[in-house]
């Protein structure tokens, strides 16, 4: 169910109900990344994000946020229309910027769904989350003036200041079954990854195992992934981390609703 009416910077529609969420798209597909890659899942993609990665694969949830305000009941009805689905993935954008995401997750859990939340790890919420799929954004994600899709570098400083919150990351790791999924652009990212993991481990009570850490090649098309997948796979083997594909890109390239 694609929805694409402009929501103008993600300000709430004055007519939207109190439990409404801005939804960019809602669809049934295969989980493409992480520990649950290949699992049939319903994806709920919220619109709006507190960061601006230059390589964002959901441009119309961040740089130009679009969507329609749907109530939790409306979202649940759409999820239940996919009768074979047992897994639901709440993604974005950054879904946890919306307080109503917690209510939606709790409802989904009450109905027996396994819930995964795809988050950049800058916000903690107390909710029914079965798997916190945390993707901390590295320095290589920062939209410098040379890489900014908008061409002006306006978000560079704000993104850089906000992209890592070690306290939020440690709370997520301590509260939920989690995976730490890093988007890797090259070998230079590994030093930052190792340093960040040390910082989280120094605060979190939960031990982070090496197989909780996943390296994923940056790329939103098959051609872009082809340029990096071998290097990232070799880095995963070299450091003892997991390699995760982007299965949906391999299967459907950059088609929406996949």
Question: What is the meaning of each model-derived region?
Answer:
Residues 32-36, 45, 234:
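Short secondary-structure boundary/capping segments within folded domains
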